[in-house]
Amino acid sequence: MNELNIIKQYGGAYIDSRDVAEVIGKRHHHLLRDINGYIKIMQESTKTNFGFSEFFLESSYFDSTGRELPCYLLSKMGCEMVANKLTGAKGVLFTAAYVAKFNDME
């Protein structure tokens, strides 16, 4: 399993969605699709006061050809949301990895 790296930015701590995708064995564009679905549900719900930016921050990166591509920065709550949708060994390992990383910062 690859190491999760904490990114300290915007006054918080985050993990890049590319790292999350690699750790959970999911293609990055599939994880982006899932995150976009979570965001859509949160935005459409009138029963909650959740701002999706508490979970996911839109970001981007440049690939090896110089193209700018989308990614997300996941807060601890964003990691928890992704982890709660996973099952089996990958879910357990990802949960253990992000909990350890964020707890190291406290």
Show which residues each predicted segment covers.
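An anion-engaging/catalytic patch
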Residues: 1-106
